[in-house]
Amino acid sequence: MAGKREKRQTTIFLLAFIVLFIASIIACVVRAKRMQKVEYADHMEDVAVTVDGESYTFRDIAFYLAYKEQTTQEQAKVYDLEHTNEFWNLHTNGSFIRIEAKDTAMDMAVHDVIFYRMAEEEELSLSEDEKQYVENKADDFWNDLEEEGQKRLGVSKGEIDDTFIHMGLAQKAQQLLADTNGVDYREYNVEGSMYQDVLDEHTYKINEKLWERLDFGNII
């Protein structure tokens, strides 16, 4: 009788061990999948961020991602021309430069969405000189990408032109708000002391599931 009881206990123990072992394997697989990098090109039409209830895809914020990659890569070349990844992977101010640059790209995108909407509400428009200026800036950015970068970014020149027009209007709305409140324009930049007050009046939600895994630094 005692032998049967011991055998039953052993069987139960083994079954419990097997269940726990399988569960741990599944947990490891799920964790690894969550940490696996995702390619920008595979998720261009997926939502990257929602601002005040309106969704914006990775395609919509393509310029900001490319711009921050460009500027960060330029800094990386100054830091170590032959081993630029050394700079990208630096840990400073409590964060990795790669992550900091990516988050800044998102912050810029959200900032411009908010101010562009202000421009629409105020019915602002660009003068002919302002239009020419943003067109030239768009051309410069597009040409700097070169053919390979343009292909990898996956958006058309027309989409980039539209983004720059929106940015120009956002900047005009930012200047109007600064003038109205008698402060310097820069106070409403992403890191400006008064921008947080503006941001607090809006809601935004980042698609963290994809954003955290985005292979930033290898888009263009």
Over which residues does each language-model region extend?
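Alpha-helical transmembrane segments
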Residues: 25-28, 108, 123
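Short, low-structural-confidence N-terminal segments
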Residues: 1-97, 193-220
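Short secondary-structure junctions and interdomain/linker hinges
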Residues: 116, 145, 180, 201-206
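Charged, solvent-exposed helices and adjacent loops that form client-binding or oligomerization surfaces
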Residues: 70-101, 120-193
